[in-house]
Amino acid sequence: MKKTVLITGAAGFIGSHLCDYFLSKNYKIIGVDNLITGNLKNLSHLNSNMDFQFKKIDITHDFHIENSIDYILHFASPASPIDYLKIPLETLRAGSLGTENVLKIALKNNARILIASTSEVYGDPLVHPQPEEYFGNVDPVGPRGVY
């Protein structure tokens, strides 16, 4: 029996490529996205794939997936300083409420989960490249504060 992967942010750049990758490795994919920054065009080539299903879901609200889930790849979040300024509350909610709701799905299914992030969490670095010990330069009221 094929394992099932839930991919949040599936219509985004990275999420859509993860859908392609895991389908090529013979997994079933449930892709979810609220389409605030994602684009269905990134997934249009998968419409006829029987192992792929897309659900327009805002993960910042409680949601339910009927299928059994084995793995979750959590990539749902605006990930650009431009988005942080344009849609700050949506960004904040994706990282907080969205992550909490995805963790509930993982717990219910006893699924393994990978939570993605970006270097944006470190703010504007004072050193380049940043060593492993670097704690960042984050301004909590600056444009990256919502991420």
What positions do the PLM features span?
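N-terminal Rossmann-like NAD(P)+-binding domain of SDR-like oxidoreductases, especially those catalyzing
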Residues: 1-147
